[in-house]
Design a protein with these regions (language model features):
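An N-terminal RHG(E/S)-centered segment typical of histidine phosphatases
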Residues: 1-52, 65-72, 76, 206-215, ...
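Acidic, low-complexity terminal tails and accessory targeting/binding regions
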Residues: 2-4, 91-103, 107-113, 158-166, ...
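Beta-strand elements within well-structured catalytic alpha/beta cores of enzymes
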Residues: 5-9, 56, 163-172
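Active-site glycine-centered loops adjacent to acidic/histidine catalytic or metal-binding residues
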Residues: 11, 87, 173
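Phosphate-coordination/substrate-recognition cap region in phosphate-metabolizing enzymes
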Residues: 42-117
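Short glycine/proline- and acidic residue-enriched helix-loop micro-motifs
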Residues: 110-144
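A mid-sequence, solvent-exposed acidic-amphipathic segment
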Residues: 135-164
Length: 232
């Protein structure tokens, strides 16, 4: 049986990413820079000769748009199974969805916990803090949030393993991917870039993290695109 490996991609840069707004379950499309970055990623994955058996994304528009670009660059549009899973959505920021990042992460949360920076909080503390300050009642507590993220990625790995292993291409979100890594090895990655790749292996019911936030595929794709422009 082939190794079961998940390639977890953070979606391309969006309008809200660009102006510093918390996206969560709200959604904006990739902008021009974001689209180019994902074309770079798709080319980089193609140049690396990676083969994918299935594709999965959250049901958010920005991950669906990202996946479409990657599959196009890989020549896999309509060629491998691709479905959506709401369990691998981003965290829900409740009444702060669509608000400025600075207001939530550098204002409200530090005041609630009497800390200087939100990175001082564990994911569990951050989730419970969001529940506390969310006036809409939409934010998920840590048990619910971590449970649906674990279940979502586990379902992909189990499906792939049952099919004989191989690689899955998965497009999700920065904090969701970071949370999954934390649940595996209790390390907390910071600032996963748009279009970065985090690789997770699955064997005998256990996950191991092979790499986090790898930008080498995007960088390789960017080089190919630059060379194509120079030769025109």
């Amino acid at each position: 049986m082939a190794k079961t490996r998940l390639y977890l991609v953070r979606h391309g840069k969006t309008m809200f990413n660009t102006i510093g707004r918390a996206q969560g379950w709200s959604d904006t499309p990739l902008n021009e820079v974001g689209e180019r970055g994902i074309h770079e990623l798709g080319i980089g994955l193609r140049e690396a000769g990676l083969e994918f058996k299935l594709a999965r994304s959250s049901d958010s528009g920005r991950t669906i748009q990202t996946m479409g670009i990657i599959l196009e660059e890989l020549g896999l549009t309509g060629q491998i199974p691709y479905t959506f899973d709401k369990r691998i959505r981003e965290w829900c920021f409740g009444s702060f969805d669509g608000g400025y990042d600075g207001e939530l992460f550098m204002g409200v949360m530090p005041r609630v916990f009497n800390i200087e920076h939100v990175h001082q909080l564990s994911y569990a503390e951050l989730a419970e803090g969001l529940v506390e300050v969310d006036t809409a009642g939409w934010a998920e507590n840590w048990e619910k949030l971590s449970g649906r993220i674990w279940e979502g990625f586990s379902a992909i790995a189990e499906e792939l393993e049952a099919a004989g292993g191989g690689n899955a291409l998965v497009v999700s979100h920065g904090m969701t991917i970071g949370t999954f890594v934390y649940l595996i090895n209790r390390t907390r990655p910071h600032g996963l870039d748009n279009g970065s790749v985090t690789v997770v292996d699955y064997e005998d019911g256990k996950f191991t993290v092979a790499c986090v936030g790898d930008m080498s595929y995007r960088e390789a794709g960017a080089k190919v695109m630059e060379e194509e422009v120079e030769t025109r």
